[in-house]
């Protein structure tokens, strides 16, 4: 197994604030911003065989610390399409994950050398259900961050 990271985010919050269209838009905008900054190549592709929408930034791997809400290294950039910098957007990626999980079964994240599996689990520490991301090493690097 891998490491488990608890993200104290109430699953009910996402259904009252965000929707699936917002989540997909934010993930695409974030990938586009990374590409415009020369940090990777954006890929948005529908795979009909698997009924899967792939949103990826090729050539990057994000550290787990980017899941911390409110962090950003690019917050002041005016050339971003997304509303926030990459680090803060990762927080929004976390929120987008939660939103997607509320609408789609089997959301997966590939982060170059790791696979991240998001789940909703009860946390005795927080006394409620929260988002939990479990990581495990990939058999071979994917060379990308994709959801």
Where is each model-derived feature located?
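Conserved phosphate-chemistry cores used by DNA topoisomerases
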Residues: 13-32, 47-53, 57, 137-147
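Conserved short strand/loop->alpha-helix "switch" segment adjacent to the catalytic nucleotide/phosphoryl-transfer site
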Residues: 2-28, 73-80
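Short amphipathic alpha-helical surface micro-motifs
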Residues: 37, 84-86, 128-132
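Conserved ATP-binding N-box helix of the HATPase_c
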Residues: 15-44, 87-98
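Non-catalytic, low-structured ubiquitin/UBL-interacting segments
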Residues: 7-9, 43-50
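Flexible, glycine-/charge-rich segments associated with ATP-binding catalytic modules
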Residues: 1, 94-112, 116-147
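Flexible ATP-lid and adjacent glycine-rich G1/G2 motifs of the Bergerat
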Residues: 52-118
